[in-house]
């Protein structure tokens, strides 16, 4: 693995790491070894708004799966996400972000409230405190109305690109 990508992982914000961890954990729920299979990897990356081609995905897998196990742990996954973010200089498309917003907006009212955010984060099986959830909400809720609208979500996601 390139040291440059490992160094870039260190530059990720806690919010970015939490978002990546939440997505990763959804697919690792049944795995005893804490790793996801390479075939699940594309699904996780698409969930996070990345859209690697099968060739790009295989290239990234070959790069991080040094032992040939066919699985990727969270640290390897972070390196892959940094690489994909770097390669995807345009960031997430409007359509991908819209899909992600709808995934969080369970009741389809056009807002992500604290409860919806909590449900999505707890679905990962990861231990996350109320304070962590409230901090994420505060970071995303720029007008302090207690919920994240689509424009706030887009602004928040710019920091993830």
From Swiss-Prot:
The modification Phosphoserine is found at residue 98. Gene3D superfamilies: EF-hand (1.10.238.10). GO terms for cellular component: cardiac Troponin complex. The keyword DNA repair does not apply. The keyword Acetylation applies. The modification N-acetylmethionine is found at residue 1. Keywords: Acetylation, Calcium, Metal-binding, Muscle protein, Phosphoprotein, Repeat. Ca(2+) 2 binds at residues 105, 107, 109, 111, 116. It holds the Pfam family EF-hand_8. Residues 16-51, 52-87, 92-127, 128-161 form the EF-hand domain. GO terms for molecular function: actin filament binding; calcium ion binding; calcium-dependent protein binding; protein homodimerization activity; troponin I binding; troponin T binding. Ca(2+) 3 binds at residues 141, 143, 145, 147, 152. GO terms for biological process: cardiac muscle contraction; regulation of muscle filament sliding speed; skeletal muscle contraction; transition between fast and slow fiber; ventricular cardiac muscle tissue morphogenesis. Ca(2+) 1 binds at residues 65, 67, 69, 71, 76. SUPFAM superfamilies: EF-hand. InterPro entries: CALM/Myosin/TropC-like, EF-hand-dom_pair, EF_Hand_1_Ca_BS, EF_hand_dom. PANTHER family: MYOSIN LIGHT CHAIN 1, 3, TROPONIN C1, SLOW SKELETAL AND CARDIAC TYPE. Belongs to the troponin C family. Cardiac muscle Tn-C can bind 3 calcium ions per molecule. Domain I does not bind calcium. Troponin is the central regulatory protein of striated muscle contraction. Tn consists of three components: Tn-I which is the inhibitor of actomyosin ATPase, Tn-T which contains the binding site for tropomyosin and Tn-C. The binding of calcium to Tn-C abolishes the inhibitory action of Tn on actin filaments. This is Troponin C, slow skeletal and cardiac muscles. It comes from Sus scrofa (Pig).
């Amino acid at each position: 693995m390139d040291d440059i990508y490992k160094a870039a992982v260190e530059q990720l914000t806690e919010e970015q790491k939490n978002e990546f961890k939440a997505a990763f954990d959804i697919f690792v729920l049944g795995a005893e070894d804490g790793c996801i299979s390479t075939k699940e990897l594309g699904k996780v990356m698409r969930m996070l708004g990345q859209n690697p081609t099968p060739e790009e995905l295989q290239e990234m897998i070959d790069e991080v799966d040094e032992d040939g196990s066919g699985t990727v742990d969270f640290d390897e996954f972070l390196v892959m996400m940094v690489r994909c973010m770097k390669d995807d200089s345009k960031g997430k498309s409007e359509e991908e972000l819209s899909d992600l917003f709808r995934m969080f907006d369970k009741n389809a009212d056009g807002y992500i409230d604290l409860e919806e955010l909590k449900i999505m984060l707890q679905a990962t099986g990861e231990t996350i405190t109320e304070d962590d959830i409230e901090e994420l909400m505060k970071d995303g809720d720029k007008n302090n109305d207690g919920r994240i609208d689509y424009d706030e979500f887009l602004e928040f996601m710019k920091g993830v690109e």
